Design a protein with these regions (language model features):
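Flexible interdomain linker/hinge and immediately adjacent N-terminus
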Residues: 25-26, 76-109, 242-243
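Major-groove DNA-contacting interfaces characterized by cationic-aromatic clusters
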Residues: 16, 44-48, 181-252
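Short, basic (Lys/Arg/His-rich) helix/loop patches that form interaction surfaces
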Residues: 35-39, 110, 114-115, 127, ...
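Short pre-functional
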Residues: 65-72, 118-135, 152-153, 280-281
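Long, amphipathic, Lys/Arg-enriched alpha-helical "connector/arm" segment
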Residues: 21, 38-48, 91-117, 126-129, ...
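Conserved tyrosine-mediated DNA breakage-rejoining catalytic core shared by Y-recombinases
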Residues: 104, 137-219
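Catalytic-site neighborhood detector that most strongly recognizes the C-terminal catalytic loop/helix
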Residues: 91-92, 99, 150, 159, ...
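N-terminal DNA-binding recognition helix of tyrosine site-specific recombinases/integrases
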Residues: 4-5, 13-21, 25, 35-87, ...
Length: 319
């Protein structure tokens, strides 16, 4: 977020020079900015269709939260005398924060027949994993004997699709692997890279149902390879197609949207909303232990988590 939504616009300004007017003007610019305008700090060439999809108010609200944290440190270090942010933060769109309660999550999960989608949704709901983190997992990240047999999952990589012009300018130390293109002339590549932030590196505990599903999935992968060894190309990822190639983020999104369209009985949320639902449920169960939940979700700071999910603390008082 810093690299793509802050640095390109105000990154060349000295912190002492920034005034409230500058920040308000910056927010106004972001409100007119297409999603994906910058990737890894590199400006992208967008299609007319892509240009119409603007940044959400929630993204701008998250930028405000990051700036608030940064400026607070600047005040503490005597670099500035006061925080130059507007009194009122940009309001996040409540529709973008639609979440499911635990009963809805369980009911929805029981309707998913696609085994790969079922596992991905299960992991997002239970472990608060991002889509790229799920697809970035490898079998070696699973330890079924750890934690006295409970089992753990190590999160240290993320998968994403990147335009090749952006990939050329990306620090090679950030990229673990670039997958071969499935089509000639492709303008983008599927990559395995370091996660969003250092806090995103974390070890999570399996639940019993999660452990059972993971073991069954690994058995399926083994069976797929045995069924057609001459056509199988093991990409090394946990989430693979029957031919061994990686499941790309756009394919997982397609499957999720198809399932969502087939089940209008559930309140419509995007895939990332499953992570929000999970984090909200964890906060309610832990009675607002933001620091503990941050360790599970991988948010950069507890402050970011708190700002995003503080509304969940009203639920127990309203019941």
């Amino acid at each position: 977020m810093v690299q793509n939504l802050i640095v390109p616009y105000i990154g060349n300004r000295k912190v002492q020079e920034l005034r409230t007017y500058d920040i308000e003007k910056f927010y106004a610019t972001l409100a007119k900015t297409p999603c994906g305008q910058y990737v890894h700090g590199v400006k992208q060439t967008l299609t007319n269709k892509q240009k119409k999809r603007l940044l959400s108010s929630t993204s701008i609200h998250e930028v405000h939260t990051l700036l608030k944290t940064a400026f607070s440190y600047a005040v503490e270090w005597d670099l500035i005398h006061k925080i130059p942010l507007p009194r009122e933060a940009p309001k996040a769109n409540s529709e973008e924060r639609t979440i499911w309660d635990e009963k809805t999550m369980l009911a929805a999960l029981q309707t998913i027949e696609n085994p790969a989608l079922h596992l991905a949704v299960h992991m997002s709901m239970i472990l608060s994993l991002r889509e790229g983190e799920i697809l970035g997992l490898q079998p070696s990240d699973l330890d079924f004997d750890a934690a006295d047999g409970r089992g753990t999952i190590s999160v240290s990589k993320t998968m994403q699709r990147a335009n090749k012009d952006a990939l050329e300018k990306l620090d090679p130390n950030q990229v673990y692997h670039t997958f071969p293109d499935r089509r000639e002339g492709s303008k983008s590549s599927l990559i395995l890279k370091k996660p969003k932030t250092k806090k995103s590196n974390r070890v999570l505990y399996m639940t019993k149902p999660m452990k059972e599903e993971l073991l069954a999935w690994l058995e399926k992968l083994k069976q797929d390879e045995q069924n057609a060894p001459e056509k199988y190309s093991n990409c090394g990822q946990l989430f693979r197609l029957p031919d061994g190639l990686p499941i790309a983020p756009e394919l997982l999104t397609k499957w999720y949207r198809q399932w969502r369209s087939a089940h209008p009985e559930f309140e419509q949320i995007v895939f990332h909303g499953l992570r929000h639902s999970s984090a909200t449920y964890q906060l309610l169960q832990s009675e607002g232990d933001f620091k503990s939940v941050q360790g599970n979700t991988g948010h950069a700071t507890a402050a970011v988590l708190m700002d995003t999910y503080a509304h969940t603390q009203d639920k127990p008082r309203l019941n």
